[in-house]
UniProtKB/Swiss-Prot annotation:
One cellular component term from this protein's GO annotations in UniProt: ribonucleoprotein complex
Sites of the Glycyl lysine isopeptide (Lys-Gly) (interchain with G-Cter in SUMO1) crosslink: 53
Region called Disordered, residue ranges: 1-39, 477-504
Residues joined by cross-link Glycyl lysine isopeptide (Lys-Gly) (interchain with G-Cter in SUMO): 53
UniProt cross-references to InterPro entries, sorted A to Z: DEAD/DEAH_box_helicase_dom, Helicase_ATP-bd, Helicase_C-like, P-loop_NTPase, P68_rpt, RNA-helicase_DEAD-box_CS, RNA_helicase_DEAD_Q_motif
The protein's name: Probable ATP-dependent RNA helicase DDX5
Motif Q motif: chain residues: 94-122
UniProt domain Helicase C-terminal: residue ranges: 328-475
Name of encoding gene: DDX5
Organism name: Pan troglodytes
UniProt GO BP: alternative mRNA splicing, via spliceosome; androgen receptor signaling pathway; epithelial to mesenchymal transition; estrogen receptor signaling pathway; intrinsic apoptotic signaling pathway by p53 class mediator; miRNA transcription; myoblast differentiation; negative regulation of transcription by RNA polymerase II
């Protein structure tokens, strides 16, 4: 399996405890060849009297900061929307020099042309340098990575040198490979300047180089929980020297099911460590984790205390039906691609939808690429590199990329499928408007998402966004029980999908197998997939064009509003379809990107003006 050293690694870094082979979700088979991650790790019994002492309070208040009055501090915190809870919280630093970082660190900061600390850095640095446990709750793009990395360097510099067989002094746990790599990219420059070694360990990559880094000794280690547990179980590293622990995007790690692994890892670390937890939201599960792992911690919140989105993002919600999404997406992309800054992330719910939408858009000539959890690490790295450098300005992604994907110039986010929670919605749209920049988020919201409508409206109101009246109508329909085709937005899917006859799908996901709403001459138990309005008598396997479409010389015509093309053997054809992009193989290995040959159609309904008069 390309890119993965084992199937077990692949499952672990997605948060699943049971192995893919040899067991089940209920637990391993009786032979116990494979087990749950971390089951070989024994919880350590710590005697603090026997442990070597270490220092963790290095903070010296700058004279300029000492002269600052309590009223001036409070005025600054209000201006930056900083809320602090806890005892003896230090004053925020207003300038980099007030943090008293080493000269090597200040040189790197100067080269990066930073003007002043962000809000979370200003308040977080004094807390972390004081050796206090802390929780930082801040929106994405707020500079939290440096908030814990620079104090980590100071912490490491004050500890004894590593000896042979020692593990890392600083451990950063991250939920995804992408986030771990991005943290490592930031850490590498600062650690190199301070003559410290930093490494990144994650699943989906060869273990050998990662093991060699650990065996040579590294002061700083960024890791995903699954791969770290692998190395702890087989004795390739240990956490005996770890005194500075960071849980980055703790809410995301809990969402991905990593809590058991996190607890196993923390059990291997001495209890008098310094712990910093970072999160974009503050649900009860994260609060419980903080109570279990942190002691007398300082809680720092940036922005509104309730669920909130970045106010620099223009949020536009289009209430529609599922069968309308494809057409609306194409119209929207035609408008976006005419802009000079057009880097766009399209979020979908499932891996299957990601692959299908990527293939469809590339067949139509759009420079799109897809990324999700089942892609090999090599392919994911390549796709992200193409996206970051603008060679493929459209990235179609599942939630694997919704947090931690740090690309500065993403201008647009499109929620093709609305996520399961408003927390995920906020994280998704947070991929744009990084730092102080602006961005736009478009969302397709269907009656099937009605359970999230109230939360979405709350997020929009908090951010002072115009609210589509159709959203308010959905709230009324939900209260009156009319939301599912009995009033309000009429649910016309039955007529669209089955030409007046009930199509026989049992769930919404079955309905998704009909992408455009035209019937097929074939009858399948789960519904043959008829993409883009195909009406064909060709043989289907699993109803998917392009991978399991068996034509045996039969030609099927695509009628979608674009020039009719002829496809044989799925979509692998030299026939040009809508643009000059031949020979599309699984959405990859194209000769060149080409924008649609036809002139961009005028936008309908985007952007929605205030009041939504259309």
């Amino acid at each position: 399996m390309s890119g993965y050293s084992s199937d077990r690694d692949r499952g672990r870094d997605r948060g699943f405890g049971a192995p893919r082979f040899g067991g089940s979700r209920a637990g391993p088979l009786s032979g116990k060849k494979f087990g749950n991650p971390g089951e070989k790790l024994v919880k350590k019994k710590w005697n603090l009297d026997e442990l070597p002492k270490f220092e963790k309070n290095f903070y010296q208040e700058h004279p300029d900061l000492a002269r600052r009055t309590a009223q001036e501090v409070e005025t600054y915190r209000r201006s930056k929307e900083i809320t602090v809870r806890g005892h003896n919280c230090p004053k925020p630093v207003l300038n980099f020099y007030e943090a008293n970082f080493p000269a090597n660190v200040m040189d790197v900061i100067a080269r990066q042309n930073f003007t002043e600390p962000t809000a979370i850095q200003a308040q977080g640095w004094p807390v972390a340098l004081s050796g206090l446990d802390m929780v930082g709750v801040a929106q994405t793009g707020s500079g939290k990575t440096l908030s814990y990395l620079l104090p980590a360097i100071v912490h490491i510099n004050h500890q004894p040198f590593l000896e042979r067989g020692d593990g890392p002094i600083c451990l950063v746990l991250a939920p995804t490979r992408e986030l771990a790599q991005q943290v490592q990219q930031v850490a590498a420059e600062y650690c190199r300047a301070c003559r410290l070694k930093s490494t990144c360990i994650y699943g989906g990559a060869p273990k050998g180089p990662q093991i060699r880094d650990l065996e040579r000794g590294v002061e700083n280690c960024i890791a995903t929980p699954g791969r770290l547990i692998d190395f702890l179980e087989c004795g390739k590293t240990n956490l005996r020297r770890t005194t500075y622990l960071v849980l980055d995007e703790a809410d995301r790690m809990l969402d991905m099911g990593f809590e058991p692994q996190i607890r196993k890892i923390v059990d291997q670390i001495r209890p008098d460590r310094q712990t910093l937890m970072w999160s974009a939201t503050w649900p009860k599960e994260v609060r419980q984790l903080a109570e279990d792992f942190l002691k007398d911690y300082i809680h720092i919140n940036i922005g509104a205390l309730e669920l909130s989105a970045n106010h620099n993002i223009l949020q536009i919600v289009d209430v529609c039906h599922d069968v309308e999404k494809d057409e609306k997406l194409i119209r929207l992309m035609e408008e976006i691609m005419s802009e000079k800054e057009n880097k766009t992330i399209v979020f979908v719910e499932t891996k299957r939808r990601c692959d299908e939408l990527t293939r469809k858009m590339r067949r139509d000539g759009w420079p799109a690429m897809g990324i999700h959890g089942d892609k090999s690490q090599q392919e994911r790295d390549w796709v992200l590199n193409e996206f970051k450098h603008g060679k493929a300005p459209i990235l179609i992604a599942t939630d694997v990329a919704s947090r931690g994907l740090d690309v500065e110039d993403v201008k647009f986010v499109i929620n093709y499928d609305y996520p399961n929670s408003s927390e995920d919605y906020i994280h998704r749209i947070g991929r744009t408007a990084r730092s102080t920049k602006t961005g736009t988020a478009y969302t397709f919201f269907t009656p099937n998402n009605i359970k999230q409508v109230s939360d979405l409206i709350s997020v929009l109101r908090e951010a002072n966004q115009a609210i589509n009246p159709k959203l308010l109508q959905l709230v009324e329909d939900r209260g009156s029980g009319r939301s599912r085709g009995r009033g309000g937005m009429k649910d016309d899917r039955r007529d669209r999908y089955s030409a007046g006859k009930r199509g026989g799908f049992n769930t919404f996901r079955d309905r998704e197998n009909y992408d455009r709403g035209y019937s097929s001459l074939l009858k399948r138990d789960f519904g043959a997939k008829t993409q883009n309005g195909v009406y064909s008598a060709a043989n289907y396997t699993n109803g998917s064009f392009g991978s399991n479409f068996v034509s045996a010389g039969i030609q099927a015509s695509f009628r979608t509003g674009n020039p009719t093309g002829t496809y044989q053997n799925g979509y692998d054809s030299t026939q040009q379809y809508g643009s000059n992009v031949p020979n599309m193989h699984n959405g990859m290995n194209q000769q060149a990107y080409a924008y649609p040959a036809t002139a961009a159609a005028p936008m309908i309904g985007y952007p929605m003006p205030t009041g939504y008069s259309q």
